Amino acid sequence: MKNLYNEVDKNEILNRLENLKVDAVRQWGKMNIVQMLAHLNVSLETPLGKNFPKRAFIGRLIGKLVKKRFINDQPMPKNSPTDKMYVITDISMKDFEKEKQRAKELITLFYNNGREKCSQHPHSFFGKLTPDEWGILQWKHFDHHLRQFGA
């Protein structure tokens, strides 16, 4: 499985981010391209230990069971629900380059920190994840949204 802790996989995502353009057309979903980048950035801050979301009630009930559908080689399903904490609406299209650069910096920090520094804080839906599960999930999350905008 692809994993942001793997250098080749990390570089693939960084290259796809580099090729992302502000005028890329959304293929599905509701977020615009800048909201999507900000969403990815905030979500990557959880395993980096920069934010600490509360567990969703539904996640406490079924998160462990559903986790297997996400921690695998299959692409994430389109139009999956998004935790409200990760829905970013108060951002301008002018922030595209800033958010794109921030994404590259956060990915690099995640990789450089290594598994040892991965936060133990539970995922808001899936609960406790190992560092490798975080790496796989984050790679898939970036892949999902980059495909959403054709990158």
Predicted regions and their residues:
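Membrane-proximal intrinsically disordered regions of secretory-pathway and membrane-system proteins
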Residues: 6-7, 105-107, 139
